[in-house]
Amino acid sequence: PLIRETLSIGIPTLIVTFVSFATTSVQSSCSLSVNPNGASITYYARIWYILPYSVFAIPITTAMFTELSSFVASGKIGKFIDGIADGCGQILFLLIPFAMYLIAFSPCLSNMLKSARMSSEDVQMLSTYIAWLSVSLPFYGVCTYLQKACSSLRKMSLFAIAECIAGAIQIVICLV
């Protein structure tokens, strides 16, 4: 029974990882078709994008995962739902202002990361990409939190299905 439970969490998580790899690969390939430095632009933008998530959202999701798991284990589903709402609120409270900071300071941030190989046009494109990517930062934080919530429920199959659908949509959008 324990192996079955472990596999019921592990296999969908592995599927989510493969889908994420595929979408990232397609996005990188598409960025190269737009601009020869497209991969560098997306890489540098992701550095700034992930920084506030890593510093602020990951500690919240890690701490809340423990609480959510204990609520599920003790059968307190009402507290589990409250925990999801509280965690989402905390993540949004922190990541919405940082998304705005990234949007406002994207020109400065892109100038800090420019290399000798990037033209001023590429730096401008990096700035624009950081600004537009930042709009999704709060949603990304909540999505990764919901992944941990599904994991604490020990029901990752629903999340894996949602990730497969979202990944397919992203790939189609990139290829069209």
Predicted regions and their residues:
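Membrane-embedded alpha-helical bundles of multi-pass transporters/translocases
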Residues: P1-V176
